[in-house]
From Swiss-Prot:
This is Dihydroorotase. It catalyses: (S)-dihydroorotate + H2O = N-carbamoyl-L-aspartate + H(+). Binds 2 Zn(2+) ions per subunit. The lineage of its organism: Bacteria, Bacillati, Bacillota, Bacilli, Lactobacillales. Keywords: Hydrolase, Metal-binding, Pyrimidine biosynthesis, Zinc. GO terms for molecular function: allantoinase activity; dihydroorotase activity; zinc ion binding. Its cofactor is Zn(2+). It comes from Lactobacillus delbrueckii subsp. bulgaricus (strain ATCC 11842 / DSM 20081 / BCRC 10696 / JCM 1002 / NBRC 13953 / NCIMB 11778 / NCTC 12712 / WDCM 00102 / Lb 14).
Length: 425
């Protein structure tokens, strides 16, 4: 059967064009005008995008499925227009052996409704200095390496990890955090931490480890990717490293682009995340970094928690914010429609073809004949409200609930099959 998406504004090759998209046998067959098919999806007035790509999600499965599981996490991704995700390995048990990795990959495929690529850990159990067998993990299905949630504390361990990752052509995606400097902090170091009387987090906890790792990456030649950069100095370090030819890429998270420490209204656990919300100066530097290419892509760091884990004050709340279901619409509304900081084409690139390119996810994040029919359709014309009852994730831990947005997802297709349709829970 042939399905045609008619009369939409299609994002293709960095441009927006008025076109139809023809789908057959799970693939894009053609993009053009006056196309016909057995089934017609009317996209008049809608944006037709490649399925978005999020290289940073936490699905808590196995081990903490009361927070999220593969099924609900992938449904949340589809609700946000994402058709390809990278799942972090901070689950229980950590998939640090070939058998555990194979099992994770199989579970992702069986339970997920989007394409799920699985990270392997940089170190065994994510908290030791012992390296797993990277070659075996890659053979079992790992697409990259990360200890996300934990910084690699020992320089020698990271140096050895980068050497082995380079040998096996694996990206090292780092959560840059020196625990001795983080020192059980809660809120960015500054006036807000003083106002709330909460332990501060110095930016040095992030920047010193980035500086260390960039030198190690230069020495080893590994592809070093930095998760959720959040400070002005981090951006400056990456900018200098790229100018020196170091093989480094990095991502920014929607919440660090949209919010600052000044937006924390009170001691509210929904605003507790790691890295923490930073200063307005840091936020401005992230936006400049995106626009000048220092920051390569946007990734959500979707980190769901049970409601009770975010109640009360920030001191005892869990770190983390959901992002899969709110990323595109909140970013589009603020930075494209309202403030005109960047274009729709730029936003779509940072959320689709750029992450796919950086991580070598071939045929993801693009609409081209012969590629998988992974498609997202968004409504840019009508205002809607973000409501808890509409979330597909088990986690409702986001301060964006109640916000009026444009860019709600109308439909998401994976391999030509509808996996999300507005109005269906």
């Amino acid at each position: 059967m042939q399905t045609v998406i008619k009369n939409g504004t299609v994002y293709q090759n960095g441009r927006l064009i008025h076109a139809d998209v023809l789908i057959e046998d799970q693939k894009i067959k053609a993009i053009g005008t006056d196309l016909t098919g057995d089934k017609v999806i009317d996209a008049t007035g809608k944006l037709v995008s490649p399925g978005l790509v999020d290289v940073h999600v936490h699905y808590r499965d196995p081990g903490q499925t009361y927070k999220e599981d593969i099924e609900t996490g992938s449904k949340a991704a589809a609700h946000g227009g994402f058709t390809t995700v990278g799942a972090m390995p901070n689950v229980t048990p950590v998939p640090d052996t070939p058998d555990l990795m194979k099992k994770m990959v199989q579970e992702n495929k069986q339970k997920g409704i989007v394409h799920i690529f699985q990270y392997g850990p940089i170190t065994k159990n994510e908290t030791t200095d012992e390296l797993p067998d990277y070659a075996a993990l890659k053979k079992a299905g790992a697409f990259a390496l990360s200890n996300d949630g934990h910084g690699v504390q020992t320089a020698q361990t990271m140096y050895l990890a980068m050497q082995e990752a380079k040998k096996n052509d694996l990206i090292v995606a780092a959560h840059a955090q020196d625990d001795s400097l983080f020192n059980h902090g809660i809120v960015n170091e500054g006036e807000k931490a003083k106002e709330l009387n909460l332990p501060p987090v110095t930016e040095l906890a992030e920047t010193t480890q980035i500086a260390r790792d960039l030198l190690l990456a230069e020495k080893t030649g590994v592809h070093y990717h930095i998760c959720h950069v959040s400070t002005k100095t981090s951006v400056e370090l990456v900018r200098m490293a790229k100018a020196c030819g170091i093989n480094v890429t990095c991502e920014a998270a929607p919440h660090h682009l949209l919010l600052t420490e000044d937006d924390i209204p009170k001691d509210n656990g929904y605003y507790k995340m790691n890295p923490p919300l930073r200063s307005k100066e840091d936020q401005a530097a992230l936006l400049v970094g995106l626009l000048d290419g220092t920051i390569d892509l946007i990734a959500t760091d979707h980190a769901p928690h049970a409601k009770q884990e975010k109640q009360g004050g920030m001191q005892n709340a869990a770190f983390g914010i959901t992002g899969s279901e709110t990323a595109f619409s909140t970013l589009y509304t603020k930075f494209v429609k309202e403030d005109k900081v960047f274009t729709l084409e730029q936003l779509l690139s940072w959320l689709s073809d750029q992450p796919a390119k950086v991580f070598g996810l071939k045929k993801a994040g693009v609409l081209e004949p012969g590629c998988p029919a992974d498609v997202a359709i968004f409504d840019l014309e009508h205002e809607t409200e973000l409501k808890e009852k509409n979330y597909q994730s088990k986690g409702i831990n986001t301060p964006f609930t109640g916000q009026k947005i444009y860019g709600a997802t109308v439909m998401t297709m994976v391999d030509g099959e509808v996996v999300y349709q507005r109005g269906e829970k």
